[in-house]
Every structure is written in structure tokens, then in C-alpha cells.
């Protein structure tokens, strides 16, 4: 590598966005209160007024989106008996990357009898975006979880589709110290052609996943009974002490509607207000 190459790499690295948020919540006088909050770079968190059913936190990416080489880290811990709902101020946009992929790391933990809800708005992948995301969840045996992620392959309203790029999504769920769910989704190269396969996404422009802990067949049946018809394709099942719903749709709005129906039935509480704005 020539000195010029080294200098170019250093300039590229220096211009990449980085952000990190780390905080915990604890029970105080019967209310969920935030503990120490650490923020750095272009990732911020804000806490609306505490509500009777728990504490809400909203993440804000002041960079306006994520590009190749960016890195964002989130570490959240819900203390014993707390109730915490996490969401984002807007959909996250992943832009075209000419070099290294963006790195997103999310670590969530919930202690005994805590309830943690991770409910971000959509992640939108632009054509030729590259991103590697990891979501690690560590639950106590008696903790509960409501988690969803929606991924949109391009902005359909603008006539855009993600045709190529790289999307790696690694999920790990531990409950009571045991690994109960592990999955890695990898899409690269001609992503448009891959999504067009009937056995993959049947041409869907948006996909989603919801995890519900604890979850069983009774919960699955209750969701099916309460929402007998969906706008897109939805599959729901339960095993190993949790329930999972998978979503595919031709547009993000329909998928969001289906996701809200499932989450509303599973939680029995209102979704974040930002989802309704």
C-alpha cells in the first residue's frame, strides 16, 4: 500500500459516523427510573415523561442515516421488576456503501421479572447498501420480551428497490443463561433476484420478525383469532418457550399494519406513540 493509499484510508475512516448509547433502568418507589446514561457520537437517547406502565426511550441518529464504514453500538439493561420500551424517532436509512459495511451492534438485557420491548421503526436499505447487524438478548428466566424488526428493501414510493448490496443480520437470544434461539440472515450480491424466489420472499419489498417471550401455542392461537386476515403474508409459531412471527409484504405500510396487529395482541398495551405519527 502506498502512502497515498494509507492517507486516503485514514481520511475515509475519519469521516465515518460513530455513535454509542449505554444505559440501565432500575425500580425506584414502584416506578421505572433511568440510571446512568452514556452517549457518544451521533447516537442520542431521549426519555419522554414516565408513564404508569413503565419508561420509554427514543433513539435519535443525528447523522441522518448510516453509510458504509459507520458504526453504532447500543447497550441497554433493564433491572429487576422494571418495564422499558425502546423505539426510534424515525425509520433508519442505510445508504449505498462503496467500501466497508456499516456495523450495528445491539445488546439488550433484562433481569428477573423485568419487561423489555425493543420496537424500532423500519430499517430502509438503499440499493448497494452494506450492513452487518448483531442483536444479542440476555433474559432472566422470569423476564419478558417483545421485540420486532422491519427491513424494507428500497423506497417503493420513490420507485426504488434494493437490487444489490449486503445485509447480514445476526440474532442471539439467551434465557436463563441458555441459548434458546440463534439465527443469521445473509443476503448479498443480487439481492433482488434472491428475494424474488417463492421460497425466500416471493418478491416482497419488506420483511419483518417479531419475538415474544414467553410465548406458547395459546398465544399463537389468540393472535390468529384476533387478526384472522393480514395484508401480507404472516406466519406465527411457538417453541422453546417463545413465539415468533414472520412477515412479508409488497410494501412497508401493509407490513407495519400487520406487525402492529400482532404486537398489540401479544402485549395488550399501546405501541409507542411514534409508531402512530
Swiss-Prot record:
GO terms for cellular component: cytoplasm. It is found in: Cytoplasm. Coiled coil: none annotated. Pfam families: UreD. GO terms for molecular function: nickel cation binding. Keywords: Chaperone, Cytoplasm, Nickel insertion. Required for maturation of urease via the functional incorporation of the urease nickel metallocenter. HAMAP family: UreD. Belongs to the UreD family. UreD, UreF and UreG form a complex that acts as a GTP-hydrolysis-dependent molecular chaperone, activating the urease apoprotein by helping to assemble the nickel containing metallocenter of UreC. The UreE protein probably delivers the nickel. This is Urease accessory protein UreD. It comes from Rhodopseudomonas palustris (strain BisB18). The gene is ureD.
